[in-house]
Amino acid sequence: MSVTVFITYDLAPGVTKDQYWEWSREIDQPMASRQPGVLSYEIVWIDGTGTGETPSQVVEVIEAESWEAWQKVNEYPEMQAAVASFFQIAEKSSIRVFYGTKIEG
């Protein structure tokens, strides 16, 4: 059964929204979305909340064949440069990873 993975984070100090968007479009999304086990890969820039406080700037929403399949993605040789650049783009202390199963209606 597939899982949905949510990764939330803020940008590292000094990284602008424009720099992030360019990196996301040119490196991250094309690379990660074509890896084995990844069914869909979407990035959402958070514009705001109903409460005024934004807990994260970015949410990645990934549909994967399984949690184990997703865990393998960052180990693939093709992903090494993207992973290294991610840790320069994202504020490490802000990264949170959640996964779960959709409740079908």
Label every PLM stretch briefly.
Residues 3-11, 43-77:
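Short, well-ordered beta-strand segments in beta-rich or mixed alpha/beta enzyme
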Residues 8, 19, 40, 75, ...:
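Intrinsically disordered, low-complexity N-terminal regions enriched in serine/proline/glycine
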Residues 15, 68-70, 105:
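Residue-level signal for secondary-structure boundary sites
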Residues 16-43, 78-83:
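Short amphipathic alpha-helical segments
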Residues 24, 28-32, 60-64, 70, ...:
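Functionally constrained cores in energy, signaling, and assembly domains
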Residues 39-59, 82-105:
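Glycine-rich beta-strand-turn "strand-cap" elements at beta-sheet edges
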